[in-house]
Amino acid sequence: MTQTSSAFEGIEEIIEDANNNTDIGIPVQGDILNEIISGARLGTLILRSASSGTGKTRQAVGDACLIAYPFRYNTYEQKWEQIGSGQKVMFIATEQTKKEIQRMILAYLTGFNESKFRYGNFSVREKRIIKQALWIMKQYEENFFIVQMPSPRIDLVKNLVREQVMLHGIEYVFYDYVFISPSLLGEFKGVSLRNDEILLMFSTALKELAVELNICMFTSTQVNANADSNTNIRNESSIAGSRAIINKADIGMISARPTKEELDFFSGIGGQVLPNIVTDIYKVRSGEWSQVRIWSYIDLGTLRKEDLYLTDARMEIINFDKHFVYEIDWEDVDYTEVLKKVNEIQ
């Protein structure tokens, strides 16, 4: 519907929103990333691209866990800590089984490598922490829904998301990941469309769902062969299948492994922890930051990530004032008492 209005109409709401931080989303993993994208804002589509084996799914599940669960175990201080938002999440898996996702969740919550949950042989201490993690998952079982969709279609995704948002009040949806499947091609049987056009239609549908339902939609894609060898800031030209996928996204980022030369640079500046992943931010709609690189360390065994440095394309470190602060409305829930109950579990 076409609308015409005065530029002044509603301007006071913008000032009020700024004062109340209503256009800031809840945190995802990574302090620098949150500063760049202003968190997981409702009504937006966040697109993360990477090659196979760089942890696209694990980063997504880690972000989903941080959003869904208020607590996780701090393995250094050996105690449970309140770090998370306690919001409702849905994870749509196109390749992983439910058990694979569940093992990742347990790894994130406990801080134990995921392989522990394949081979067992837990110590007495580990059994206690796992029991506590299971109690947390039970307490917040309405916060994390897993959907297996091995044969995705646009109409199926749209109907599913609308239904689950209505039934459970979900505000954060992870779709893993956008690709051309036989079922998706079958949806357009008899219509002369190229693969890149179909992928654009898929990403458009995800963005429309984000706006229509006022949710934050996360998704990911593969990258083409040029991405790993590119030492400049990677952009939509590195996306496999269709560079037009980014057209509807609000945030666009590509993750890759640092080169030896890049690691030597960070060794030279005396960093105690070397990054094992670099994320190139090439699109930020409604943001001041773009064409920057975030250097992080991610433990793929526990899905936990820490941002270390922010640089430009010339590898010059960017120092910036942090403005990202998100105040979570806990709705009068006393999480001190909840943590006390967790620690009482033996």
Language model regions located:
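Cytosolic-facing regulatory segments adjacent to core modules
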Residues: 13, 31-35, 70-169, 289, ...
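Core recognition of P-loop NTPase motor domains used across DNA-transaction enzymes
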Residues: 1-43, 51, 76, 80, ...
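Phosphate-binding/switch loop-helix module in NTP-utilizing enzymes
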Residues: 144-209
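C-terminal regions of RecA-like/P-loop NTPase motor modules
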Residues: 3-10, 81-84, 111-119, 145, ...
